[in-house]
From Swiss-Prot:
Heme is among the record's keywords: no
Cofactors: pyridoxal 5'-phosphate
SUPFAM superfamilies in UniProt: PLP-dependent transferases
Gene: serC
Residues the entry annotates as binding pyridoxal 5'-phosphate: 80-81, 106, 157, 176, 199, 241-242
Presence of the UniProt keyword Cytoplasm in the record: yes
Cell compartment(s), UniProt: Cytoplasm
NCBIfam families named in the record: PRK05355.1, serC_1
HAMAP family listed in its UniProt record: SerC_aminotrans_5
Name of the featured protein: Phosphoserine aminotransferase
Organism taxonomic ancestry: Bacteria, Pseudomonadati, Pseudomonadota, Gammaproteobacteria, Vibrionales
């Protein structure tokens, strides 16, 4: 659809908006990168120039997340869904059971894959609180005594649910942070494994980050393919096979951009301001509603419904004409969804709220 504005704000849940400065830099370097006369896509992943890209990206990510030295940072392929299989195959060791916390769609997607490799002890953490959807405090999660690890998804993009606490357990905690990594400060040392598909807050689709504590590298199943084996990837510095070099390069540019914004602490303040603005307007309105309790509302993904669902298509059409794109909710829940990852400026959320006010005034 043709837009009636030169400014477009992309609320896609993923692949998501990249920082404009990153895209402009990549555009400027695309044909002649680093004065080599070729694109970064065209050089060997084992060449010194690309090894410098890889090392710089890892160093910046370690700085941004304060990753301790006893963790490996792996740049993997296959996205988070590959990690749904990689996690049990890497971490079970001699165990046969793992606990998975169910708080939404992606947590259960991980469960379905893990069931191929182990007995999955599922704990349903979803509850109703004050008429809204919420999640039990992590202190109340039931974790099996014989579990090799406990897995959860801190941010559910479809449901718009965020979990902000961790259980106290001696089991390794594994977190699918695909949609929340780098959006807020975390203590990496409290986790055994963190993994995240790139296409939300890291870079373009095609690469996945895994942060793995060293003591968990020797538990892999003999059946585990080499491309998913954390120890092999660590030993080969994520170059066991040819990696997605352009996605790796772009992710490195995003890390540089984020450091220039002041790092994760600074971007978290912006993210909280964006979320407060949007949720605040939704809560003040009788025309829009959000079904998630404030204790567990996602900073990154804001689903909302109109009081008149028959107006959904009209809302989307008029929003797109205003340069507010990719607001259609996931098919599982319907309605609308505004994904407001790190690259979404506060001005974009303000533009959305202004449009929502105008739409309500006209159609309520």
């Amino acid at each position: 659809m043709e837009h009636n504005t030169d400014t477009v704000y992309n609320f896609s849940a993923g692949p998501a908006a990249l920082p404009k400065a990153v895209m402009l830099q990549a555009q400027a370097e695309f044909v002649n990168w680093n004065h080599l006369g070729t694109s970064v896509m065209e050089i060997s992943h084992r060449s010194q120039p690309f090894i410098q890209v890889a090392e710089h990206a890892e160093r910046d990510l370690r700085d941004l997340l304060n990753i301790p030295d006893n963790y490996k940072v792996l740049f993997c392929q296959g996205g988070a869904r590959a990690q749904f299989a990689a996690v049990p195959l890497n971490l079970l060791g001699d165990a046969e059971t793992a606990t998975y916390i169910d708080a939404g769609y992606w947590a259960m997607s991980a469960v379905k894959e893990a069931k191929k490799y182990c007995t999955v002890d599922v704990f349903d953490a979803k509850i109703e609180k004050e008429g809204k959807i919420a999640v039990l405090p992590a202190s109340e999660w039931r974790i099996a005594n014989n579990a090799a690890y406990v897995h959860f998804c801190p941010n559910e993009t479809i449901d718009g649910i965020e979990i902000n606490d961790l259980p106290v357990t001696d089991k390794p905690i594994v977190a699918d942070m695909s949609s929340t990594i780098l959006s807020r400060e975390i203590d990496v040392s409290k986790y055994g494994v963190i993994y995240a598909g790139a296409q939300k807050n890291i870079g373009p689709a095609g690469i996945c980050i895994a942060i793995v504590r060293d003591d968990l590298l020797d538990l892999a199943s003999d059946l585990l393919p080499g491309v998913l084996n954390y120890k092999i990837l660590a030993e080969q510095e994520s170059m066991f096979n040819t990696p997605p070099t352009f996605a790796w390069y772009l992710s490195g540019l995003v890390f540089q951009w984020l450091k220039a914004q002041g790092g994760v602490k600074a971007i978290e303040e912006v993210n909280r301001a964006k979320a407060a603005l949007l949720y605040g307007y939704i809560d003040s309105s009788d025309f829009y509603r959000n079904e998630i309790h404030p204790d567990n509302r996602s900073l990154m993904n804001v689903p909302f419904q109109l009081a008149k669902p028959e107006l959904d298509d009209t809302f989307l059409e008029l929003a797109e004409a205003r340069g507010l794109v990719s607001l259609k909710g996931h098919r599982v829940v319907g309605g609308m969804r505004a994904s407001i990852y790190n690259a979404m400026p506060l001005e974009g959320v303000q533009a959305l709220v202004d449009f929502m006010k105008e739409f309500e005034a006209q159609y309520a």
